[in-house]
């Protein structure tokens, strides 16, 4: 049997899938620790590695494989179901098996996505400060037509200070915070003026290396729900620009409260793909 994680109906991705839109012909890049391409619930069609000695289609950490499943786990009667199971999935490895990496590797990954005509990129990663090269890379990606999605960060509210990380904090990037199954903000979810939308990020069940599955918490888990939602919109309306897709997601989100803590609210991809 196939498990449908709670996040799929919570963002109404099930409704869009039922219309026949599942992300076909949309190229999504997971900029992360790589993807365990041997997993039977994932189909990786390409990628690149910017971590020396590691190939893109392996994942010694697990993070990237989990993120990938939330976007794209196959609709195949087994395992779990992703938000957009028919996307063309690309593994862009910029973080090592410990989950750490350099801004230069991340920049190279973003540039690879831009050069290879990807439609959506997910960055479930971040740091407390940015870099000129990182800003230029995400700005260029967005200008080239890529929907750029990133985890807002797991630094909490820290006495209501702005805790949004980079690259999420940049204008060209959709910063995604985390809610639980009851639509309450996760205590760890970063806050700030740049926070754009919320998605499920508590006890998210997805693919994991060695052909297994596990539940994880984090804005890292919320971000791929939004990347997948963008892919669903693009599979229904292939001619939309990145800014149009972004606007649909934010303008149709369900308000959950103060924008400093919730952005525009929980994404509703059924409404966004009207």
Curated annotation (Swiss-Prot):
Q: Where does Ca(2+) 1 bind?
A: 2, 41, 74, 76, 80
Q: Where is the Peptidase S8 domain?
A: 5-273
Example GO biological process: proteolysis
So what EC number does this one have?
3.4.21.62
User: Which reaction(s) does the protein catalyse, per the Swiss-Prot or TrEMBL entry?
Assistant: Hydrolysis of proteins with broad specificity for peptide bonds, and a preference for a large uncharged residue in P1. Hydrolyzes peptide amides
Keywords in alphabetical order, please: Calcium, Hydrolase, Metal-binding, Protease, Secreted, Serine protease, Sporulation
Q: Which GO terms describe its cellular component?
A: extracellular region
Q: Which top EC class is given? A: hydrolase
* InterPro entries in UniProt: Peptidase_S8/S53_dom, Peptidase_S8/S53_dom_sf, Peptidase_S8_Asp-AS, Peptidase_S8_His-AS, Peptidase_S8_Ser-AS, Peptidase_S8_subtilisin-like, Peptidase_S8_subtilisin-rel, Subtilisin_Carlsberg-like
Q: Does the keyword Cell membrane apply?
A: no
Q: Which GO MF term does the entry hold, naming one?
A: serine-type endopeptidase activity
Enzyme active site: 32, 63, 220
Cross-referenced Pfam families: Peptidase_S8
Binding residues annotated for Ca(2+) 2, in chain numbering: 168, 170, 173
The free-text note explaining how the cofactor binds reads: Binds 2 calcium ions per subunit.
Chief localisation class: secreted
Q: Where in the cell is it found?
A: Secreted
Protein family:
Belongs to the peptidase S8 family.
Q: What is this protein called?
A: Subtilisin DY
Record the organism: Bacillus licheniformis
